[in-house]
């Protein structure tokens, strides 16, 4: 059995340490309260309880169990001494809040960090520097920047304040990069003017530089659309045609028009291969300031093309993107593997959904790629348009979708918009805190939603007043806006232009505890829907009161699913079907242990 030390390092559980600690506490006054046999019984019981959890336990959890068992033996004076000892040690630790965790990072024995993000290798110097900065930022955030009740609620797993290691800086979460504006109208990267590219391959190269710059100025993911690169296929076609005609003139050859077209298209195809490969390899080999490759999603949507010619060019880019992803990349051992990034999203639409449709071959290729590489992800144009006022657009980075928004001319706008940040509510804790009483459930729910609202407003207010100079690539040079130097970004924080999200976790366990059944059971589904509607109404109310784009965020937690489970077990013990796992179910998802086929799950 393993334990997690306070600095995040993992070590083997040692029962002798409990015996020694309790014995020392008992020997610190005249006359012992417990015999050696009683102390050993306490240690063995604590070991038994820890083993039943089926996971690594923290030092704090072990000390809580020890304290409870001392009390259970009736040794109240000893328990008081033990509590005082813990308090004194906590004061020492508070006076030196980050040293141990940073040292454990440098020595590569911080187990929390190893499990936190599979995209980061904590043994690498550049990654360590990011984690070290994160520790300092998190420490500042918890001690000086956030209200104490929000910090405590986060520590206790009542809520999760996302990305607190970036909160000290004025940074936002994720976005849709307005690549079209930057390529068509030019941009500035590191003080260097970048004008409109004169070929497809150059456009791809510039796109990767933009991606790296954007990733270094935010903590969340970003998305680009291949449709914004498609116009440069024609630019390259015209350029190649001019070059071929010049070559023909030089050697005195006059090819028939069809032969000329074949030569041009052949060279163009090579350039598309080169450009797509540039994006594929640059994205996974670039290192950003947050110690990892850019978290990028690439959107593949034929109907974003402005005309039929551009749609055909876009189809060529999509085809090559899928082919290269199907092939994969070689790792250091020379084995073909699936790269983590960029993520791919393929849109199913009328032109590619049915056999016989002009671009069905792309859907077949996408399905083939999915069967081997588990990408791309899919969006139904038809369903998304039903839900998003007739629009189809990508999620921001991983999974956060914007709400429709119109500019002053009444035109919908999606690219150039962003998410301010996320706070997640632990629905399981709401249910358990109510004791199963439905009236109390809604009362506790209101209290927790108010806590989330205040935490989200901390996120919003941290961005408020930020100058465009903080991230010129984002705010001045087109990725998100074209603001002037020294101009505040405040206007972009209101009116629904950007979103700020309430995440939720554990709907399954919440419903299971309150009703005794899964939320997929027809008799319990209504309660699950009531919970969802309640959160949605809260967001609508906050939006109305503040003119800020509050929204609901599904699937918000990753490693926090384990943190929440650990906190629930500590607060409420092991409850079969609710807290008996080392994780809780993410958002509205069906529990992994539940027997259900894929199609029923999708329908649900």
Question: Where does each model-flagged region fall?
Answer:
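Charged, amphipathic alpha-helical regulatory modules used
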Residues: 1-109
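Buried hydrophobic packing segments
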Residues: 18, 22, 229, 233, ...
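Amphipathic, well-packed alpha-helical segments that form the structural scaffold of globular domains
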Residues: 23, 453, 457, 508-512
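Short, hydrophobic beta-strand segments
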Residues: 44-51, 296-304, 509-512, 516
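Conserved catalytic cores of very large enzyme subunits
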Residues: 88-92, 98-496, 517, 521-604
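Contiguous, well-ordered alpha-helical segments that form the cores/surfaces of helical PPI scaffolds
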Residues: 500-513, 533
């Amino acid at each position: 059995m393993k334990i997690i030390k306070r600095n995040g390092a993992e070590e083997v559980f040692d029962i002798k340490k409990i015996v020694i600690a309790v014995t020392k506490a008992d020997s610190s006054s005249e006359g012992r309260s417990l015999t050696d046999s009683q102390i050993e019984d306490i240690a063995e019981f604590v070991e038994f309880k820890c083993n039943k959890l089926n996971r690594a336990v923290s030092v704090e959890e072990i000390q809580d169990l020890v304290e409870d068992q001392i009390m259970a033996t009736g040794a109240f004076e000893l328990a008081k001494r033990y509590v005082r000892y813990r308090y004194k040690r906590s004061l020492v630790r508070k006076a030196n809040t980050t040293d141990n965790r940073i040292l454990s990072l440098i020595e590569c024995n911080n187990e929390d960090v190893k499990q936190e993000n599979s995209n980061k290798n904590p043994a690498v110097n550049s990654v360590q520097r990011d984690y070290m900065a994160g520790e300092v930022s998190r420490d500042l955030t918890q001690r000086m920047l956030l209200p104490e009740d929000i910090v405590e609620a986060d520590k206790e797993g009542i809520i999760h304040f996302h990305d607190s290691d970036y909160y000290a800086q004025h940074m936002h979460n994720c976005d849709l990069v307005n690549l079209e504006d930057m390529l068509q109208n030019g941009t500035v990267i590191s003080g260097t003017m970048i004008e409109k590219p004169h070929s497809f391959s150059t456009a791809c190269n510039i796109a990767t530089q933009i991606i790296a710059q954007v990733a270094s100025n935010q903590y969340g993911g970003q998305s680009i659309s291949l449709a914004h690169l498609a116009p440069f296929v024609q630019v390259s076609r015209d350029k190649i045609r001019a070059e071929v005609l010049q070559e023909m003139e030089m050697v005195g050859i006059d090819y028939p028009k069809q032969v000329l077209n074949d030569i041009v298209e052949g060279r163009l195809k090579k350039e598309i291969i080169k450009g797509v490969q540039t994006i594929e390899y640059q994205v996974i080999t670039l290192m950003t300031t947050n110690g990892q490759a850019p978290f990028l999603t690439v959107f593949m949507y034929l109907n974003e093309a402005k005309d039929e010619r551009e749609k055909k060019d876009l189809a060529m880019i999509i085809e090559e993107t899928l082919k290269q992803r199907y092939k994969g990349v070689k790792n250091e051992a020379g084995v073909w593997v699936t790269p983590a990034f960029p993520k791919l999203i393929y849109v199913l639409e009328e032109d590619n959904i049915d056999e016989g449709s002009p671009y069905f071959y792309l859907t077949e290729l996408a399905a083939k790629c999915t069967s081997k590489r588990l990408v791309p992800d899919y969006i139904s144009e038809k369903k998304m348009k039903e839900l998003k006022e007739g629009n189809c657009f990508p999620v921001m980075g991983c999974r956060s979708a914007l709400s429709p928004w119109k500019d002053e001319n009444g035109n919908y706008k999606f690219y150039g918009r962003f998410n301010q940040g996320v706070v997640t509510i632990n629905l399981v804790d709401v249910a358990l805190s109510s004791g199963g009483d439905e009236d109390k459930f809604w009362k506790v729910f209101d209290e927790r939603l108010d806590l989330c609202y205040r935490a989200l407003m901390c996120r919003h207010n941290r961005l408020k007043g930020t100058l465009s100079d903080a991230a010129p690539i984002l705010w001045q040079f087109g990725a998100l806006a074209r603001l002037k130097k020294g101009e505040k970004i405040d206007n972009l924080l209101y009116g629904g232009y950007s979103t700020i999200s309430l995440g939720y976790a554990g709907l399954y366990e919440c419903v299971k505890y309150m009703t005794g059944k899964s939320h997929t059971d027809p008799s319990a589904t209504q309660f699950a829907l009531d919970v969802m509607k309640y959160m949605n109404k809260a967001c609508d109310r906050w939006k109305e009161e503040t003119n800020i784009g509050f929204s609901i965020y599904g699937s918000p937690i990753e490693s926090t699913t384990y943190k929440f489970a650990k906190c629930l077990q500590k607060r409420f013990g092991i409850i079969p079907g609710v807290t008996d796992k080392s994780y809780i179910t993410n958002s509205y998802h069906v529990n992994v242990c539940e027997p259900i086929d894929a199609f029923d799950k999708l329908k649900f």
